[in-house]
């Protein structure tokens, strides 16, 4: 594939937002910060993925059906929500990542306004002990090959786009879409 063809695919990027993501004013602000078009569709797992127009004119995903993405971003608004997922919603959360792994998906998990320092200092509103919280993060990183990222909520939209763009660029350069 030529550099021109690679750029043609990458410039067609559209972020797909799972229909379960609420369209709050803050969410709309995040979507607008992608810097590329976005649309809502049903994702089998994850909150965000990206669609691209391939060289033959087809789209990577048919959004009229449930999408099983190659790369996803799961977003948590803070450590409280992440702690909830590891405790009260653990089975549902685990099933989602099992579905992703069954489709060989690459998984990014963004936790806004969190940090390992905040976890270790128990600076979140949950009785979930810091040691157990850290153990869950490290175990799930290994078990589901999840890449955890902590960031400011102001960075989230840009990071979602960047993670998905770079994943596709690596796939193209690795020959995944060569005819």
How should these model regions be labeled?
Residues 1-68, 80-179:
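Non-catalytic C-terminal interaction segments of nucleic acid-processing enzymes
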Residues 71-77:
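Conserved catalytic cores of phosphodiester-cleaving nucleases, focusing on short active-site segments
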């Amino acid at each position: 594939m030529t550099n021109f063809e690679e750029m043609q695919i990458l410039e067609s990027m559209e972020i797909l937002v799972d229909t379960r993501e609420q369209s709050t004013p803050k969410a709309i602000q995040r979507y607008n910060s992608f810097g590329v078009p976005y649309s809502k569709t049903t994702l089998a797992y994850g909150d965000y993925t990206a669609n691209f127009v391939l060289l033959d004119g087809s789209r990577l995903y048919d959004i009229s059906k449930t999408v099983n993405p190659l790369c996803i971003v799961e977003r948590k608004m803070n450590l409280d929500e992440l702690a909830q997922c590891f405790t009260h919603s653990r089975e549902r959360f685990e099933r989602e990542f099992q579905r992703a792994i069954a489709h060989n998906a690459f998984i990014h998990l963004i936790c806004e306004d969190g940090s390992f320092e905040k976890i270790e200092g128990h600076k979140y509103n949950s009785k979930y002990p810091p040691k157990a919280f850290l153990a869950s993060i490290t175990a799930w990183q290994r078990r589901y090959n999840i890449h955890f990222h902590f960031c400011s909520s102001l960075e989230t939209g840009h990071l979602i786009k960047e993670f998905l763009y770079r994943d596709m660029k690596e796939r193209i350069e690795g020959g995944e879409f060569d005819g």
